[in-house]
């Protein structure tokens, strides 16, 4: 089984954690932006059914 030879330093651990947090923040920002565009009706890349009651 593979085991690390030395303990990872706090700075390396913090750097990796910061990268992970930055990626998560970017994904959250993108999701929020897409959600806002869908709710405001400005989204161009989504197709969803629209309830059309004029058929009666």
From Swiss-Prot:
One of its GO terms (biological process) is translation. One of its GO terms (molecular function) is structural constituent of ribosome. SUPFAM superfamilies: Zn-binding ribosomal proteins. It holds the Pfam family Ribosomal_L32p. InterPro entries: Ribosomal_bL32 (IPR002677), Ribosomal_bL32_plant/cyanobact (IPR044958), Ribosomal_zn-bd (IPR011332). Keywords: Ribonucleoprotein, Ribosomal protein. GO terms for cellular component: large ribosomal subunit. It comes from the Bacteria. Belongs to the bacterial ribosomal protein bL32 family. NCBIfam families: rpmF_bact. This is Large ribosomal subunit protein bL32.
